[in-house]
Regions:
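ER/Golgi luminal nucleotide-sugar-dependent glycosyltransferases, focusing on the catalytic module
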Residues: 1-52, 56-237
Length: 237
């Protein structure tokens, strides 16, 4: 009934077969459903696409204009085979996580989006993850890093899993925008607007637009080696 209501207002609803194995944090569900939506958009001739969550809302009345204007201002680096940059959200894009681009929102050329989300399904069983140190889980095996690192492989870039390379990729291929630009609303877990902000260096500090702009404008802005100490040294065994 509800799906037909959506279709009656011109929304195309796609149904996907559930994966045989969900993957860590239901990663395989996200990969399959996102790829199916992007592939359908490509068939329909959609040149650009937005990936969002159904439990989040964006109230900005200038959303599409703002996103397209950003792509006009910041062309992609010529060193990569990309139609345009990908616009990522500061929210849940943690500054000190390797390739930690939030998987909640992404906007860009549909061909580039297909490259970004075309990851192999996660086949690691939960028992295998138990043997991985917590630090490595946070830096290399979370959903965001898994997807982004496979995207790099899809465009011929070998992930180095360092902060310096992570920030170079951000500088060259992405634009990070603050969630306030989208007027984002997401009441899950908490209704606080700034759930991660502590206003001091910390592991949950997000990659905000001002941080990205500093990266974009200044090659020497890359972090010093000693900032690696911020990476948590927990779960050692």
């Amino acid at each position: 009934k509800y799906l037909k209501n959506f279709e009656s207002i011109g929304v195309k609803v796609l149904l996907s077969k559930a994966p045989d194995f969900a993957g860590r944090a239901n990663l395989n569900y996200q990969i399959l459903s996102t790829m199916k939506g992007l592939e359908e958009g490509e068939k329909l001739g959609c040149e650009y696409a937005i990936k969002t969550r159904t439990d989040q809302r964006f109230y900005s009345t200038n959303l599409s204009r703002d996103l397209f204007n950003l792509l006009k201002i910041y062309p992609p680096s010529p060193n990569y085979n990309m139609h345009s940059r990908l616009i990522a959200l500061s929210f849940n894009s943690f500054k000190y996580r390797y390739y930690g681009i939030s998987d909640m929102f992404l906007f860009g050329n549909t061909q580039d989006m297909l490259k970004y989300w075309n990851s192999p399904l996660d086949t690691k069983k939960y028992e295998e993850y138990k043997t991985i140190k917590q630090k490595d889980l946070w830096q290399q095996y979370c959903s965001e890093t898994y997807i982004a690192s496979h995207f790099l492989k899809n465009i011929g870039v070998t992930p180095e899993f360092t902060l310096k390379h992570t920030w170079k990729i951000y500088k060259d291929l992405f634009i990070f925008i603050d969630k306030e630009i989208l007027d984002m609303y997401w009441p899950k877990y908490t209704n606080l607007d700034s759930r991660w902000r502590l206003f001091r260096p910390n592991m949950l500090e997000e990659m905000r637009h001002s941080d990205w702009l500093n990266l974009y404008l200044n090659d020497d802005f890359f972090i010093k080696e000693d900032i690696e100490l911020l990476i948590p040294n927990i779960g050692e065994n």
